[in-house]
């Protein structure tokens, strides 16, 4: 089993959390913008969603909130991520869809945050989404992701969201 490493600094985690608090008050509009953009970028994703999109938007925002809160202790989400990956697989989500979702997410954040969507914020959110998407894809492919939260002067804290070859239980999400 192969593990992929994603590094985030405490500052990047803080930026994601800080800017997400600005999204929460506009979460319904942000979710609607997200899906509108996703369907424009990748029309094949439209058929993956059945039912009420407002409810789907609420689920999206709840999932983002959970990820944002868990970025510095991602191992607490392993069970949930594995379950989500398996549901996505049953719905027909393919690996390339995660690229479209990431692009739609960054665009939505840019629209919602306006001047607060700085290059540093973009990079922080891109890394946070990388943690999520690579974890979901890795869960299905038998790979894992190691999240490194960089500390000062070379010290770091490692969170592994990967299988036994990485020394941690497999994805239980």
Residue ranges, per PLM feature:
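Globin-like tetrapyrrole-binding proteins
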Residues: 2-173
């Amino acid at each position: 089993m192969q593990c992929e490493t994603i590094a985030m600094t405490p500052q990047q985690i803080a930026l994601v959390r800080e800017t997400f608090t600005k999204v929460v008050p506009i979460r319904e509009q942000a979710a609607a913008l997200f899906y509108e953009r996703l369907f424009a970028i990748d029309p094949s994703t439209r058929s993956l969603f059945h039912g009420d999109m407002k409810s789907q938007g609420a689920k999206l925002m709840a999932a983002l909130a959970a990820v944002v809160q868990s970025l510095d202790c991602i191992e607490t989400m392993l069970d949930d991520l594995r379950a989500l990956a398996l549901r996505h697989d049953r719905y027909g989500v393919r690996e390339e869809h995660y690229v479209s979702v990431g692009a739609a997410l960054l665009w939505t954040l840019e629209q919602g945050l306006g001047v607060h969507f700085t290059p540093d914020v973009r990079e922080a959110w891109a890394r946070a989404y990388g943690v999520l998407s690579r974890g979901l894809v890795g869960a299905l492919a038998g790979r894992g992701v190691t999240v490194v939260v960089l500390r000062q002067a070379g010290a770091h804290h490692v969170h592994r969201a990967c299988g036994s070859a990485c020394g941690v239980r497999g994805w239980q999400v």
